Amino acid sequence: MYTKEYYWFSQYMIITSTLVLTIIWSILPSSLGEAAPKQFINTLLDIFPQRRWIITLESIMLMGMLCTYIGLLMYNEDTLTPPLDSLSTVTDAGGQLVIEDDPDVFVKKWAFKETSGIYDLSLMDACQLLYLYDNDHTST
């Protein structure tokens, strides 16, 4: 029943302990091996890779992560972001635009009345209503 939780917890513990052990192994000075018993040091040297390889692999992984983050940022900005003149930057796919050819009919019928959430005004019409027309149309 709880096998996934145990799996993820054990994976987290193994990865975290490996990371901590690798960082400690790469930071420890070489003179520390002289104070410890030779049997223990020889066993560790057989298990762990050389210190130069650990630092090299850490550097390669860090540069790989940096390139991945920069690549994802560029992909998001170039591919996933819609252009500024696209209608999807203002409305969503569920929006229904009100289109009237005559501006006076549009103003009288749609501009200053509630849309009840069924129709959306286009961006140009909203800008015209806010900044171009006088407040004289509000009395009609």
Curated annotation (Swiss-Prot):
It is a multi-pass membrane protein. Keywords: Cell wall biogenesis/degradation, Endoplasmic reticulum, GPI-anchor biosynthesis, Membrane, Transferase, Transmembrane, Transmembrane helix. GO terms for cellular component: endoplasmic reticulum; endoplasmic reticulum membrane; glycosylphosphatidylinositol-N-acetylglucosaminyltransferase (GPI-GnT) complex; nuclear envelope. Its EC number is 2.4.1.198. Its main location: endoplasmic reticulum. It holds the Pfam family PIG-P. InterPro entries: GPI_Anchor_Biosynth, PIG-P, PIG-P_GPI19. It is an enzyme of class 2 (transferase). GO terms for biological process: fungal-type cell wall organization; GPI anchor biosynthetic process. Present with 752 molecules/cell in log phase SD medium. Part of the complex catalyzing the transfer of N-acetylglucosamine from UDP-N-acetylglucosamine to phosphatidylinositol, the first step of GPI biosynthesis. Involved in cell wall biosynthesis. Component of the phosphatidylinositol N-acetylglucosaminyltransferase (GPI-GlcNAc transferase) complex composed of at least GPI1, GPI2, GPI3, GPI15, GPI19 and ERI1. Interacts with GPI2. This is Phosphatidylinositol N-acetylglucosaminyltransferase subunit GPI19. The gene is GPI19.
